[in-house]
């Protein structure tokens, strides 16, 4: 079954929300010790990056405030450098970069959902 733009938007939004749920109420130290949580967060970031790559350029250009290259680039690092992933950087990304990104993703989803 061919995936649609809406599917990728849902993937992107859902994975961003998952990372926040997975890390809610835990400390960096707990995150570093809990392999299940860190792996789940890494997987969600991979999904976000893959979905970002699948969103057409004409859509991405309408939302320049979303750091498309950074989102996709994180996926590439996680996939290709999996053995050298620094969990502290993942934690910082989830805690500092994703919270301001989520409202932008939601706005984009709401606007585009009307067109789909």
Task: Report each predicted region and the residues it spans.
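Solvent-exposed interaction patches of small proteins and small membrane subunits
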Residues: 1-116
């Amino acid at each position: 079954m061919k995936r649609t733009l809406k599917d990728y938007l849902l993937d992107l939004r859902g994975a961003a929300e998952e990372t926040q749920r997975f890390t809610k109420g835990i400390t960096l130290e707990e995150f570093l010790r809990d392999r299940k949580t860190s792996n789940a967060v890494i997987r969600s970031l991979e999904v976000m990056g893959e979905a970002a790559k699948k969103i057409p350029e004409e859509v991405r250009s309408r939302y320049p405030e979303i750091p498309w290259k950074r989102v996709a680039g994180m996926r590439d690092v996680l996939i290709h450098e999996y053995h050298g992933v620094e969990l502290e950087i993942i934690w910082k990304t989830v805690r500092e970069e994703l919270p301001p990104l989520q409202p932008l993703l939601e706005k984009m989803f709401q606007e585009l959902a009307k067109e789909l």
